[in-house]
Amino acid sequence: MKITRRTVLRLTGAAAASLALSSCSASGSAILGSNFSSWLQQTLGISSSGAASSAASSEDMAASSLAASEQPAASLAALPAYDADPLTGEAKRSNGRIVGVMVNNISNTSRQNARPQRGLSSADLLIECKVEGGITRFCAVFHDADSIPEIGPLRSGRDQFLQLLMPYQALYYHDGESAPCTKFISVYNYSGLNIGGKSYFNTPTHPHVAHRDSRGRNVAYEHTEFTSGKEIRQAAANAGIGLSHDYDTTFFRFADYRTGEENAMQGAASGRTVSITHSDHYKTSFRYDPQSRTYKMQMYSRISGKFENTVDELNAKQLSFDNLLVCFAPIERYSGDSGDVQQVSYISGGDAYYFSRGAVQHGRWEKASPEHPLLVYDKTGAQMLFNRGKTYLAIVDDDEWSNFSYQ
């Protein structure tokens, strides 16, 4: 049997995820390491020293890259200490805890329709990935609870979003969750808020932390739930979860706000229009607006059969982003799942495309474990330099690479 790189990525990714869910305990990472190493030896004939060396070098690279990005250059010694907003790279606005809210994106029929959503234009980071049945879902990420307006419709949690938030101890806010997501939360003892999983939130002592609004439309009940920063604060207080956190790192490596540094994308290919296919009926596109220096978002609507502006219902504004990051990864159905819950093999890494200022840089991304951050590297092997501002992050199936385009 011929073993290609893609086969190896899928096999190792699936094995690692399975071990993470079934074998981890209080000594989680150690168990994962020993089991994964032995599995590699048996399956691919890799020596234990080789596997250990590879794992160690990967961890060393991540550690050194993070350390380098967090340490100011000697020439910056006279400047104030670097204290950036973890999601945008701008000067820090608060010491609040990052909050990620799961938002519905279904648009199949007039009754099964969550669009237009509310509150997405206020998110500092918007993550999109398919979850099941080809449908994508959003995780709207905010630098603190106080910055969250009314947002929704809410939907259930998925581990592919949770894993991106875990390294930052973000509050993960959702209604319901998949079985793999439940396992991740249990295995890693993660503090989140599944408001659909705690019946006491509906008692007089702990009032509702979300509200319903059909918006005068004949939509299914599951597409009518909304929340807000105020309600999230109440839910966190009810559960005894703190909403303060002093971050000393950022989600991406951002250009330094203290010096006005910028990634001018010199020598990069043109990237003024971007077309992303998540599945047959869930497609996202962007067009660069040179006046605002942002990318304007559109999504394909199965109902209308055409692309439509992605608009925040609260303010009628089209969603726009300073940065786009498209990461390709092996995605497939969880083995043994009775439905179509999707598993992202983060341990495999993959191609990354960073768009900003109307241009694109091609690189690689990696994520060593659920507790390690997503790291993005350019072609030289250095961490990709992001311009400050809002970012759209797409996690896209490798199988859709041929349908991805930009110009």
Tell me the role of every PLM-derived stretch.
Residues 70-123, 132-407:
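A surface/extracellular/periplasmic glyco- and lipid-processing/surface-interacting theme
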